[in-house]
Every structure is written in structure tokens, then in C-alpha cells.
A protein has these predicted regions:
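C-terminal amphipathic alpha-helical segment
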Residues: 181-192
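Short proline/glycine- and basic residue-enriched helix-capping loop/turn segments at helix->loop/beta transitions
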Residues: 193-197
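RNA pseudouridine synthases
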Residues: 1-180
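Catalytic strand-loop-helix junctions within cyclic-nucleotide turnover domains
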Residues: 163, 206-208
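Long C-terminal interaction/binding lobes of large macromolecular proteins
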Residues: 200
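Short beta-strand motif preference
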Residues: 130, 213-215
Length: 287
């Protein structure tokens, strides 16, 4: 049995839709079966798929805890710095409305109640995420990520279309549309634009017109790698926001092929106790 409170202020929402939003990694059939059996109670009343919830409602879910309270996948921890592996599709934290019963942070809080995220990944992107259970370590890590100094991030991706050069550095500017939650690459400075730099290296061919690439975001802007590679003419497979939707349909079921695979703490990093350490997480076999 799992007790849950709907965040205050949430507008009336269909119960099944809310459950999927709050627990995005739980298979849909788990909720469908529970609602059919009336194993979900809203404010004490047995409820089904036709019911709604709103801010402040109390939910009681009679569902196996393995679906609702999974453990975090931990790559390294000394109970001060935590290096977790976030699965694709799992948000790092609750959304703007406070919805998020299953996030990377809630998983970490079961073992480290005071843990804080040092940086973020998009929900669709998987791989390494740093968190801290120690205030001093968190401040050091926050400084490193804020100043883009002291940590080197390496991503693995699958990119479409043949490359003219096996490696290179891309420079441009990024404009953010906060209302739409999207960004746009431009090639000259403009009001509100921030400079971006991305390094790429082609590694091997995964299929005709599809290449495994290593990416390094020298700057760390929202959606930088996805938007920059699409602007470069090599969108990432599975990216329906910035990429090639027609090409993506040739690989049904494939998620965004972007994975934070390695993180190196440099010798001059503010993370003084972890200088020289390197963390690696193998990318999935997408195709």
C-alpha cells in the first residue's frame, strides 16, 4: 500500500492520466488493472478510470511497491557525493505543478533524505547524474556546473546522415523560448541569445546513414546537444522535437538516443575531494 497526496493547486485531472504523470516509469497495464479492480482510493473512496483528482486529494494505492517505489541505480557514493544512473523517461524532479511521485530525487531521498541534485538531465535523456548529501560537496558541485569548470561531460548518441568530417567543434548561439519549453539555434549574437559550443567525434556506423557519436557540451545549455546537432544537419535518432520525425519512424519504439555516459572531475575542479575521478555508465543498445 502506498499513500500519496496530490500537490496543492492542481486542476481537476483524470485519475489514470494523473497516475501516469506521477509515476511515468510504471507500465500502463499496472494502473489499468488497479483501476479496473478499484485498488486505488481517492479520499478513502474506491475509484476507477472515470474519476478525477485535484490538488490536496489523498490517494491510497494498493499496488505492489516494486512498481511505485523502485530503488535508485547508484554508480558511486561515499554518502557525501552520489553518482546515480537515471533511466530514460524518468524525470530528475517534480514538474512545474509539483507532480512527481517517482523521480530520480524521490528515489535518492529514500536513502539520503537531504540529497540535492547538482545538475539536471532532460527526462528523455538517461545516464549519469550527480547529487550530494553533504552541503559542502553540493556547493562545490554547484559551482563547478554553474561555471562550466571542473567537470567534463561526455555523451553517447546516435546521429542521422553521413558526416563530412569525423570530428569537430560547433559554435553558435541559443535562444530559449520558456513558454514553449524549446530552444532555437542562431548563428549570430542576438538579444537573449547565449553562446554554445559542442564537440563531436564520429565513432562507428550503426546502420546505413546512422552513426554512433561522442558529444561533449563545452557549454551546458538547455537542449543544447539535441538542438545543436539538428542545426548541424545531424539530428539525433528518436528526437521528435528537434530532429527528423520521418527518419525516426523507420525505428519504431526507439527512444531519444542520447546518454550521459561519462563524467570526469578535472584536477582544478571545485570538487576538491574528487579530483581526477572518472565515472562511466554504458549507453543502451538502441538499435
Amino acid at each position: 500500500m502506498t499513500a500519496h497526496r496530490v500537490p496543492d493547486g492542481l486542476a481537476p485531472t483524470p485519475l489514470e492520466k494523473y497516475l501516469r504523470r506521477a509515476w511515468p516509469m510504471t507500465p500502463g497495464h499496472v494502473f489499468r488493472d488497479a483501476l479496473k479492480k478499484r485498488d486505488v482510493r481517492v479520499n478513502g473512496a474506491r475509484s476507477g478510470a472515470a474519476d478525477t483528482v485535484r490538488g490536496g486529494d489523498a490517494l491510497t494505492l494498493y499496488i505492489d511497491a516494486r512498481w511505485l517505489e523502485p530503488e535508485a541505480d547508484i554508480l558511486f557514493s561515499d554518502d557525501r557525493l552520489i553518482v546515480a544512473i537515471k533511466p530514460q523517461g524518468l524525470p530528475v524532479d517534480a514538474d512545474q505543478s509539483g507532480v512527481g511521485a517517482d523521480t530520480l530525487l524521490t528515489r535518492l531521498h529514500r536513502r539520503w533524505p537531504g540529497a540535492r541534485l547538482c545538475h539536471r538531465l532532460d527526462a528523455a535523456t538517461g545516464g549519469i547524474v550527480l547529487a550530494a548529501a553533504d552541503d559542502g560537496v553540493w556547493e562545490q558541485a554547484f559551482q563547478a556546473f554553474r561555471d562550466h569548470k571542473g567537470v567534463v561531460k561526455g555523451y553517447q548518441a546516435l546521429a542521422l546522415r553521413d558526416f563530412d568530417r569525423p570530428e569537430g567543434t560547433l559554435d553558435a548561439y541559443l535562444l530559449k523560448d520558456a513558454r514553449r519549453g524549446e530552444v532555437r539555434v542562431v548563428h549570430r549574437d542576438a538579444p537573449g541569445a547565449k553562446p554554445i559550443r559542442t564537440r563531436y567525434r564520429v565513432q562507428s556506423q550503426a546502420a546505413p546513414g546512422l552513426w554512433r557519436v561522442a558529444l561533449e557540451p563545452v557549454t551546458g545549455r538547455t537542449h543544447q546537444l539535441r538542438a545543436h546537432m539538428a542545426d548541424f544537419g545531424h539530428p539525433l535518432l528518436g528526437d521528435d522535437r528537434y530532429g527528423d520525425r520521418a527518419a525516426n519512424r523507420a525505428y519504431p519504439g526507439v527512444k531519444l538516443c542520447l546518454w550521459h555516459a561519462c563524467l570526469t572531475v578535472s584536477e582544478d575542479s571545485p570538487l576538491a575531494d574528487y579530483r581526477g575521478m572518472r565515472f562511466e555508465a554504458k549507453a543502451p543498445e538502441w538499435v
